[in-house]
């Protein structure tokens, strides 16, 4: 525990007494001005072996007491102060750094870990996944499915005009039967007439006319 005993020098006693002796300031204004100028001159700032003291300035009662630089206030061991203390330098450096970052819009880089995902790559992967899902998705709308099958079959057919209508229906029906279904709740309903029913109807009508 630091020694709480504090030695009071003669200068400290003189400064303390001058706080209560205001008669020297009541003579005239020139005397007060002269005292203030002399007390603020560098020659009136005394330094001891292990402390720095300041004599009475005469400016105010609070500034009249001699200030002694110690480690932990008035009580404690006297220490030498060579420049700004280390903790004050650290505080100033941190404040200056924050102000610099604020003015220049720069922030200290955060370390990247293996668990973190780059936002740009995340968006790219999501877009890729959506495109893949759209590619293999089978529509549940029968009209849309029939339209797709119809356009696919027409594009696969040659441009030969001799292709019959029954061949086109057979091709569409075979494609519709082989199309995969995502959900069993949506069975494929065949709204188009079958080839056999068309042929039978045609044959029946021809027999009636004959």
Curated annotation (Swiss-Prot):
Listed under GO cellular component are: cytoplasm; nucleus
Q: Which UniProt keywords apply?
A: Phosphoprotein
Q: Where is the composition biased (Polar residues)?
A: 33-46, 102-116, 191-210
List every stretch annotated Disordered: 33-58, 100-139, 177-210
Q: Which residues carry this modification: Phosphoserine?
A: 18, 39, 41, 57, 60, 178, 189, 192
Task: Give the Basic and acidic residues compositional bias ranges.
Answer: 130-139
* Additional detail: Present with 1890 molecules/cell in log phase SD medium.
The protein in question is named Uncharacterized protein YER079W
Q: Where does this protein come from, organism-wise?
A: Saccharomyces cerevisiae (strain ATCC 204508 / S288c)
What taxonomic ancestry is recorded?
Eukaryota, Fungi, Dikarya, Ascomycota, Saccharomycotina
């Amino acid at each position: 525990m630091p020694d709480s005993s504090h030695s009071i020098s003669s200068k400290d006693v003189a400064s303390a007494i001058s706080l209560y002796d205001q008669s020297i300031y009541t003579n005239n204004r020139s005397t007060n001005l002269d005292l203030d100028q002399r007390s603020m001159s560098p020659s009136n700032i005394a330094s001891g072996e292990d402390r720095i003291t300041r004599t009475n300035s005469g400016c105010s009662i609070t500034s009249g007491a001699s200030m002694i630089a110690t480690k932990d206030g008035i009580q404690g061991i006297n220490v030498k102060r060579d420049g700004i203390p280390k903790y004050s330098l650290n505080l100033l450096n941190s404040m200056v750094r924050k102000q610099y970052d604020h003015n220049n819009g720069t922030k200290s880089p955060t370390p990247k870990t293996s668990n973190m995902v780059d936002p740009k790559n995340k968006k790219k992967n999501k877009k890729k996944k959506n495109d893949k899902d759209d590619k293999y998705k089978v529509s549940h709308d029968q009209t849309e499915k029939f339209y797709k099958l119809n356009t696919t079959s027409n594009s696969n057919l040659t441009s030969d005009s001799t292709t019959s209508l029954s061949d086109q229906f057979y091709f569409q029906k075979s494609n519709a039967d082989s199309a995969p279904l995502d959900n069993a709740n949506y069975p494929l309903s065949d709204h188009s007439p079958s080839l056999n029913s068309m042929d039978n109807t045609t044959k029946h009508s021809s027999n009636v006319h004959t």
